[in-house]
């Protein structure tokens, strides 16, 4: 796995996709990114609640079978794959390569986002939550053409999305309304 990630980075570096990745990192950018991560996790929660309350589907998870495969691996390996390998490789593909290859940025935004959601869900009701998530992650990338920022948001959702949904659900149940 690590060898694959190293090869992906070498190819991306040779093709020039890593140009803006480490420029101008300051406290303002870090707080902006933390806000985006929180916003994304909250949006993920709201979409999940909306989809489940309307009973379009019974659970909001990808139906690609990846969770079955990952479930057989040790937890540390799962976190490594979901938190590092998958976000970095998918962001290089969908944001750096696909988004970066299309000159019309609105078309690039739409194609990159929709392809990301389709690869994760196929043509199913699961598409809606993934499409909204993909729009947010693509927007983060489009702000500075920096795939590391979008990979951080992507990784946060992969690692903390389920926990955030449970935490926010508990929080909203405690509110007196």
UniProtKB/Swiss-Prot annotation:
Domain of life of the native organism: Bacteria
Membrane topology: Multi-pass membrane protein
The keyword Signal is annotated on this UniProt entry: no
Localisation: Cell membrane
Keywords, alphabetical: Cell membrane, Membrane, Transmembrane, Transmembrane helix
GO molecular function, one term: endopeptidase activity
CC per GO annotation: plasma membrane
One GO-annotated biological process of the protein: CAAX-box protein maturation
Key word Manganese present: no
Transmembrane segments: 2-22, 30-50, 117-137, 152-172
Pfam families reported for this sequence: Rce1-like (PF02517)
Main location: membrane
Family: Belongs to the UPF0177 family.
Name of the featured protein: UPF0177 protein YxdF
Organism: Lactococcus lactis subsp. lactis (strain IL1403) (Streptococcus lactis)
